[in-house]
Amino acid sequence: GKQVYEWIWKKSSHTFDNMTNISKDLRLMLNENFVINHIEVDKIQKSYDGTIKNAVKLFDDYLVESVLIPTEDRTTACVSSQVGCSLDCNFCATSKLKRMRNLNPDEIYDQVVTINNQSLQYFDRPLSNIVFMGMGEPLMNYNNLVKSIEMISSDKGLNISQKRIVVSTSGIPKMIKKLADENLKVNLALSLHSAIEVTRNKICLLYTSDAADE
């Protein structure tokens, strides 16, 4: 079990055939009974400043966006948390898409793995930072968000410090408090849009906290 776990999470293997430190019979049994779902980069768009935008295909053919943002002192992964979005912010293109489903923890994790590989390939350095600022409202996919952060920061996963992870939210008070109670060391970015509540509510329609997927 430990070997399989390491191959899937530490080495990001997408096939049981690669797991050379387990028996051939066990690999055969795993292939016959299980499937390792994984994301695929469907399209890549490169900018003059080095930014790489990926259209990522999920196992059910939905597409989300993941972006590699390079600067002089860091490379940052901007990852998605939902297919579409639970909110309706009138300045955001994603809000025009119906929220189809939440991303699973492994799909969030795989985005980071993919962008880390691109960072190594194109910039010869590993990923240094992660921001949850892609498609979707991260706090409306709360449990899967937390699980992915725990796995990304684990020494059994990518071992990226939680202090280098930013969760961006449009502001769901109940879920912000819940995240604070988790005692994670991640940073929180609040998209305020306006300091005037009436104006803010016109810009971004926040659903009630009861709508949050817990």
Q: Where on the chain are the PLM-derived regions?
A:
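Alpha-helix boundary/capping residues
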Residues: K11, N33-N37, I115, I152, ...
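Flexible, acidic/Gly-rich N-terminal and inter-domain linker regions that tether
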Residues: G1-T75
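Conserved small/polar residues in nucleotide/adenosyl-binding loops
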Residues: Y207-E214
